[in-house]
């Protein structure tokens, strides 16, 4: 196969790397030689010091000789240190030059790759011409002319185009197809994986970014690594590449790179600040690594270090994390300079048009720059347009997206069989289930708030899992492990029957649960039964996680069970050595359960994978599982049926139906419904129930296809035998089965007499009631009460009441002295003072009001009472003004007042700065008659290459119109302005980028205004000096023009 011309540059960079390495080795050898020489010199000096002096006359001569030798050695050592320091400096310079050369080469490729991109996309479908109108503008300009010459190009242009096509044909650009895997890939790639590699190569050669969305378990990691291996082997491109993935999968990425392509040098960029500093300085150096593997959090924290590099490929695993374009992660990833972006996801694209646009915008921001245009293009205007929308979606996604299912490509992979195993409740579970429904009877009967119903649902699901999840349910202390751990939960009884059968046939088991505390119970059970196990949950560290996976997967491992939390253990883990998956409870989102199942059902699996989904019969879990199946059925219709509006959360009616489901059966009996059936019989019944549910879902899918594309259609509403359950009188069910709680009876004394009974009936004399102690109201510092004085009055009142009560208790006793006087009651004046002090404070102001007041002060300044009052709910302007006055005088009474005042002053400084900016812009614009056309900015050295003068002029004028800080409005103004309709660079800028450019322009304007003011002052000063130099001429002129008689007359008047 012919190599690309770029390979020469890559090989030259390899030679340069080798030279740098050789120089580094020489430097290290020289350092060792110097160390050895200095060490030997020291030994000689020490030996000379220790040698005895035999002749007293010869000693001074030897001393002089040694002094000269020491000076000479010191001079040599000094020169060597200087030389080594210079070598270190040269080494750093070489590394920096290498980094700059590497970045320049990547940037040059980045500029070249876009040339054929639109052409390639337009070959796929003409739809991209709609999104990339700007690229067509140039061709329209070329087509200007008259008559038959309107659409012709010149002969030179035609020849140049032919030459380019010939060159592409000779070099095979864009036509590479590998028949065998790269030789540096260890192991054997499957046919569909090689096809996936060829698809990635085609994207690379056409300058296109893509989404690899194969189903989980098909080897997306291997396909990605093989692409980097292809670049290394056939193109001579060693990187640098960056892989950004969830923290839990970094260990797997490093292992897979070492396993499949050990020639690629991978660096794991993770750890505490000290470890990261070491990696930055010693490992993350140009020429020393090919792949940087890091987490989402590290990419954000260490973005400065990572931005030093221009990357060949940025690969994002679990790419659905960037579907929100406004998230910090998505913004950070857009900052990195890269030739190509590859997104990897195992979950299907959700049927949300905006999230789909966000991914496409990340891949091709210059083409998919406008979400509004994208939404308009796929807007469904009528029932007949549905098929057209589906076709448009398919055409847009085809060049970027590759998604294949196991059933389509991996014929040799054993099938996966799912069985729902239903089990009853124990007596203890029924008691708790009934108590939970009775506790929130009003909400369950009438339908409360969604949040309240969701909480009830969660509690009921905990009860279905194990009653010991509730505080105080487990007998103890002391807590013991025994059969009660099994018999008190139906699912544990089922698990205890199932595991011995699986152990007999040499199966290995993964048990998933959403609840970490349930994993604790399962851990106790496994220890009780003597089963060896591993465990991973959200609190498991990275090293411990990798060690557990390795211990479970190693050949001959005796670990029988692997306990995993569904969320933490469902990503990036290969546990194909297991062949049974037990879902102890089901997630609301069925995709999460699928991810969990695919830990075992993946490439490398030799056995049929059995999935057992536990379900508590006649309880909320039946409805949860049913809903999950419905959602999976709908997900299959997402793109193929053009359904663009997704129901993401459970609505209130669904929750109510789930909570009520099975209530009648729970209340009708107290006894346990756990049967003694054999496990084989339970599995057979489960298979029947699963088949019935599959049939129901098939009918539901058929019904859903017939629905119109109408917002009012409820995809979760279908014909169901239990549809009328919401109409049951739930209150009646509870009252019919209600058992009054037993009354608390007084225990009988062991041997009681009639006299004692009679005495008891007569009763003891009533004790005097405890005095009602006045409770001091809770006084907060922000309410500005006189707390010190109120506390004094309160304590005085309490002392008097307690003293009075003590007197009453002791007045009938004998030989007991009366206590000393404890104080007097509050006087009328003190009572009035107390009431007045309570009214002086702001008792109606809550902590929330106080925080709102502080935020408003930061936003508007302490003096803008009207604006502050507009932010306060339930407070009049007069109340706010009164509070602001007291706050200004007594703010030092507040806890942490320094921080509060600093925040307010910082906000006021921002307001002041904003006013200064608006004045500076206004002053600048006042110097022009039409600033929208005439405004000029003195750039100096800050012109920049990205923004032109027309863009800067528009930006300044819009800030003057909209106000400083309204960046989203400024961004919208650029997007809607006809002036910039073809300027995709400006239209694709984020609000933060526009803000940074505005700040740069404002600094230039302020500097220009200062220079203008200085010139104005200088001009006024010169004018004033000129005026002061000319006045003497005016009187002389007037005096010369006056007649002698008028002069004589003025003299006469002055004498008078």
Swiss-Prot record:
Highly expressed in growing tissues such as inflorescence and flower meristems, young leaves and floral organs. Expressed in roots, rosette and cauline leaves, stems, flowers, inflorescences and siliques. It comes from Arabidopsis thaliana (Mouse-ear cress). Interacts with RLT1 and RLT2. Interacts (via C-terminus) with RLT1 (via the DDT domain), RLT2 (via the DDT domain), PTM (via the DDT domain) and DDR4 (via the DDT domain). Binds to FGT1. The keyword ATP-binding applies. GO terms for cellular component: nucleus. This is ISWI chromatin-remodeling complex ATPase CHR11. It is found in: Nucleus. Residues 494-645 form the Helicase C-terminal domain. It comes from the Eukaryota. The gene is CHR11. SMART domains: DEXDc, HELICc, SANT. Residues 141-151, 1047-1056 have a biased composition (Basic residues).
